[in-house]
Amino acid sequence: VTVIWSPRAIRHLSDLRAYITRENPDAAARVALTILTAVDRLAEFPNLGRPGRVTGTRELVVPDTPYVIPYRLRAERLEVIAVFHGRQRWPTRLWGVTTPRP
């Protein structure tokens, strides 16, 4: 499975790393590496995440972090949609589909 990051997901990862770097650059690097490693693992085990709150998606809760990675599988592609903090309010629309509120 080939992992493809959406522009939104790339921006989220970059923004969260910049935010954490202001207080603790080492922690920012560790968190980013943990997220990247978790997503790389999805290439081997694409169904590792739980069913997503949007039909047709899955969500990976990144171990040892408060982050959740929504993604979807399309043939031999795994598309990373975004990177969200677990306490963050999700947008009302995600890839053109209305996101239900928990």
Where are these regions (language model features)?
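Arg/Lys-rich, positively charged N-terminal/basic patches that mediate binding to nucleic acids
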Residues: 1-32, 100
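Short, flexible helix/strand-to-coil boundary loops that buttress conserved ligand/catalytic motifs
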Residues: 17-20, 46, 82-84, 94
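Generic structural signal for secondary-structure transition and capping sites
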Residues: 18, 25, 40, 44-47, ...
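Short, hydrophobic secondary-structure boundary micro-motifs
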Residues: 29-30, 50-52, 91-92
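Basic/aromatic recognition patch in beta-strand/loop cores that engages polyanionic ligands
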Residues: 37, 44-78
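Enriched for short, Lys/Arg-rich terminal
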Residues: 68, 72-102
